[in-house]
Amino acid sequence: MKARTDNRADLDPSSWDPALDAVIAAPKHHKVLFENERLRVLEVTLEANDEEPVHHHRWPSVFVFDQVQGPVHDFAPDGTQLPPNRDLIKAIEAWKGQGCLVVNMAPQPLGRVFNASGKTIHGIRVEMKANR
């Protein structure tokens, strides 16, 4: 599997296919806890050695993990491995494993995540919709 740089991130998230939104395309892994016109709060769960279907997250978010461990791999829809999410990797490396890990996340274009660790990933993702 070859790695590549991800140049899809500069696309306008408002143009992304709504049918591939995380809640619709990967409902087993994304449960809506709360939603209004400004916020959407998701419970995200990815079991050890499980892979999410292809999906995107169109809004910036704050991800509060109460359980996470690497390695976690991101893949483009065509199966090419994407570079690691640097913000998440840096945060995991600095985290002492106590309390929660909080990570600021940019919108994430279409892709899928594989949890290659031996531990379930679990957290709450607060997505911030654009002001209307």
Predicted regions and their residues:
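A short, N-terminal "cap"/entry segment at the start of jelly-roll beta-barrel domains
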Residues: 1-44, 48-54, 81-110, 114, ...
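Short, conserved beta-strand element in jelly-roll/cupin
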Residues: 56-72, 76-78
